[in-house]
Amino acid sequence: MSKFSLLDHELIPHHEIMDEDDLKTVLTHYNVEREQLPKLKVTDPIALEIGAEPGDVVKVIRKSQTAGEALYYRYVIG
């Protein structure tokens, strides 16, 4: 029996852990600290699926009817 992956479900947007260079650019652009971003618990099923650890920032790429793609950033907490 194969394991179900959350990332394969059509209603779950794409999630990826950001690298430090891209993160620095985003934080500078929005003039925020990583701790000011919306939170994502490390125990959240999607965080477990992608292997996120406390302190990581996850970029969520959502499909949007008006914008095509909408980017969203979440700070992983313990």
UniProtKB/Swiss-Prot annotation:
Catalysis: reaction(s)? RNA(n) + a ribonucleoside 5'-triphosphate = RNA(n+1) + diphosphate
**Per the record's keyword annotation, is Cytoplasm included, yes or no?**
yes
As recorded in UniProt, its EC number(s) are: 2.7.7.6
Give the Pfam families listed for this entry: RNA_pol_Rpb5_C
Q: Which UniProt keywords apply?
A: Cytoplasm, DNA-directed RNA polymerase, Nucleotidyltransferase, Transcription, Transferase
Tell me the domain of life: Archaea
- Subcellular location as annotated: Cytoplasm
InterPro entries per the record? Answer: Arch_Rpo5/euc_Rpb5 (IPR014381), RNA_pol_subH/Rpb5_C (IPR000783), RPB5-like_sf (IPR035913)
Please cite one Gene Ontology biological process associated with this protein. Answer: transcription elongation by RNA polymerase I
Q: Which GO terms describe its cellular component?
A: cytoplasm; DNA-directed RNA polymerase complex
* Keyword Transferase attached: yes
Main site of residence?
cytoplasm
GO terms for MF: DNA binding; DNA-directed RNA polymerase activity
> What is the documented function of this protein?
DNA-dependent RNA polymerase (RNAP) catalyzes the transcription of DNA into RNA using the four ribonucleoside triphosphates as substrates.
Q: Which PANTHER family match?
A: DNA-DIRECTED RNA POLYMERASES I, II, AND III SUBUNIT RPABC1
Concerning its family, UniProt says:
Belongs to the archaeal Rpo5/eukaryotic RPB5 RNA polymerase subunit family.
- Assembly: Part of the RNA polymerase complex.
What is this protein's name? DNA-directed RNA polymerase subunit Rpo5
Source species taxonomy: Archaea, Methanobacteriati, Methanobacteriota, Stenosarchaea group, Methanomicrobia
